[in-house]
Amino acid sequence: MTDQPNASQQDDYTQYASTQEEILQAVRENSVRRGLFFLKNLSALDVDGIVQDIEQLGREYDMELWRERAEEAGISPAALDTLDAHDPPVPYPYYFCLPGDLVREPRLVLYYRNVAMISNKVMNNIGLDTTQHEISMPLGVDKAQSIAQHLNKITSALVMETGLYGQRRHLEMVYVNIGASLDGGWRNEVGRLAYVSVISPIVLHLHRLQKLKSIIFKVKGRIVLEDEDENDNGKIQEVELQGRSEQEVATLLSDLEDQRIVYRQINLTNGNSVLLNRQMYWHNEETKRRYRIGPDLITEIPSDTFPWAAELKGGADPAGSDEHWKTATQAFNRMIDAAEKTHRPIPQLSFMATILVDRVAQEAALWLQQGKLASVHNLTKIANDPAMQQDFLNQMVAFFEMTLDETGNST
């Protein structure tokens, strides 16, 4: 961290620093969003319905048939003995599956994969992808056999090693593993929601001003089933918004947010584009070297020049505020270095965050005074103040529309 600011700097930074109540507000709002994310996914996956199907199997299964087919399905007879030894005995379908049941009802794969406490990502990596079958895509006999054997061998070991004491332990295993998957998805969702909270209002504002041409995006879908960073196969789409009514645009954005939109680009009527969450390289033609940058937002004008860029940090945990600032300043410094070494104009820079603790607000204010930053935005403060919201939208429009003068300076 830098030296402590002087008295005048102290006065400046307080307008950006989050109060204790603002931090509590941000944490509450983040907790609600996280809870809704988990609950919506559990509902969409129909976990309760799948569990009811498993319990029905447990009431109807033929113990002798299961014993006959156990080894070919990858089930250890010793594991079945362990379930029989419980008082009362535990039904075999609570932990193990037969291939025929998976063919009949592919959604059961979700249950048995989670009982085995293995992730979709790992299943995909070993050539036994289950993702689409878990939302009812038909499953062939051979693949069902391979999946059943793999999962049953894992669960057999878990049963024999632990005894799995407790009549509801199978449900605990399912929900713990689903929770772990959703938690990983939530960590990615925090950043996506930060983009949406900033970009959607700007898109509407640009449209009202008749300065918006189109948006480019992809959607992740309503359900999180796998590691989305590793399986980022969403189709890129472009929608022309120029000429549409305000209600049409608002309805479209609401529908896209429900499908978990990922904004990629905003195209303005003046020819500028704002690129979002991009990795790009700037080249020095003389040295043949290239420099990688990855701004969260960056304005591109038609001459392949970039007059403005920003870092956007979601998340409400005050313990992470310092790290967010550190990550942002590293990104800023990479952009400055890349611009200097490729003989480009240095972009004006902005920092946006859900909260700013005092230390971060002090440093951000110092960067402003030193001319390193063009603006700093505390998104929770902005959300609480209509006047600040309007000022923020107007500033963003100015940054999005920015051009360069004859000297190469941003205007």
What annotation goes with each model-predicted range?
Residues V122-R290:
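The feature marks a conserved, polyanion-engaging helical scaffold used by nucleic-acid processing enzymes
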Residues V32, A44, R59, A85, ...:
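Generic surface-pattern signal
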Residues I216-T411:
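Catalytic core segments in nucleotide and nucleic-acid processing enzymes
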Residues M1-P201:
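Nuclease-adjacent, charged terminal/linker segments that flank catalytic cores
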Residues S76, L209-L212, P345:
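Short coil/loop linkers at secondary-structure junctions
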